[in-house]
């Protein structure tokens, strides 16, 4: 053990504005990099230490695995010795996708779904609820005492909006894309012959103009001068087959054919149903608008997933509560259970409360679990990363923190300090770039650039 390296040795660092820097960085301690803007703080932290730490770890994996992962390029440095595997908690974490929420990102939703699977009142198909029972966890048959119908208690997976518990209409996104009628004819002074109906120009054959004429619509009159009946045919007309005579625009070719009418709205809906990639979506999305799903009211959950009740509220309502309020509500669950259910309830609830603690310490108690992760600020997403890092209980990792105090209320600085100390206690190393003096004072070592 006496020969175990105590420092990372960096020699000849030339990344960005670093000019042949040599520096030793103590391991298993908090090291802060300070300096004026442009001095190379982030270049040393991210461009050298994180880049080399993550790259070398990935290079130790098999070729098959590396092909499926993106790795950093080799840093411009003569030598880096004894750098551990590195994880970066970026100042600007990547924006999550549409299916990610505060609840999924923190994994709090996993515990909450387990509560609703094991501890909830479940109901039969006739709407009769039964009290919480150990028979659910034991996977025993449950019969409604009122109508004698068999009761199905959904599993945690059946309560997940990214899986079996998804709303059938929106697919678990909470939003639906519908045709934006105003986008179909953007310039209402044009005639149909002049290309007034935009989807027919980009998503459909141009001869749809000829079919529309056969439907009884005047195609040589400005759209804003057409009758309501003609406009209705353009927007919503029936899919009737018409015999048309058509002539190509740029040649003398002409002919007759039977063609089915696609109204402007259906043209977009049909194109949307056939989208297979981002390129295809870009052609269609300009004719769409997003609205809250009318089926699930934005909760993302199916009707069945919203049925189980704990303390008289469903999973959807629990996810809408701010974390501060939700924690207090969860604390009351064990005492609301029948005596034989209380030990299991405490175990499940304690798991939720344990994960919540760090998030509350980091000042995220105002967020609800259903908050779309894409709407979170960069500071909020970074604090989620920090809380997850502590929960994972890793050891021997170099954590590179790029301005972790950004967006943090002064009252929550000590929560951040507690997180960093926990990471060190578990045998990790921290390298941070920050301007907050309270954070910098906690460092064991300073590197002044």
Predicted feature locations:
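Walker B catalytic motif
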Residues: 372, 403-404
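Conserved Rossmann-like nucleotide-cofactor binding loop
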Residues: 438
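Conserved hydrophobic alpha-helix in the ABC-type ATPase nucleotide-binding domain
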Residues: 415-416
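H-loop/switch region of ABC-family ATPase nucleotide-binding domains
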Residues: 433-435
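P-loop/Walker A nucleotide phosphate-binding surfaces of NTP-dependent enzymes
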Residues: 2-375, 381-397, 409, 419-425, ...
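ABC-family nucleotide-binding domains
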Residues: 402, 408-409
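H-loop (His-switch) and adjacent beta-strand-loop-beta switch element
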Residues: 421, 427, 443-449
